[in-house]
Amino acid sequence: MRASLLLFILLVYLAHAPQAQGVFGPRRCKGKLGYCRSKCQSKQVELGKCSTKAICCGISTGTSSSQGSHEVPVINSEPALESKPEPQDTQEEEATMVSE
């Protein structure tokens, strides 16, 4: 009876261990960007587009071990707004002042 209970607990643990964060499973990214698959890739993708479980890899080292894994900082997906020079209406203003 005890052996079957221990075997059942072991099977449940093994079934759910890869999903847990920590030593046995991949660390999940808390941001929106990360790497798909169990090995690090050179390209980051949105985690919602990953068909497999996503892990966070070290950016500088590129390691996928649980010691080298860490959160990938969220990169702003919106393009930076370029500061455009304002149109110069000074000539029109000067022209209206002269004509008055």
UniProtKB/Swiss-Prot annotation:
Keywords: Antibiotic, Antimicrobial, Defensin, Disulfide bond, Secreted, Signal. Residues 60-100 are annotated as: Disordered. It comes from the Eukaryota. One of its GO terms (cellular component) is extracellular region. Its main location: secreted. It holds the Pfam family Defensin_beta_2. It is found in: Secreted. Residues 1-22 form the signal peptide. Residues 23-26 form a propeptide. Disulfide bonds join C29-C56, C36-C50, C40-C57. Coiled coil: none annotated. Belongs to the beta-defensin family. Has antimicrobial activity. This is Defensin-B4. It comes from Ornithorhynchus anatinus.
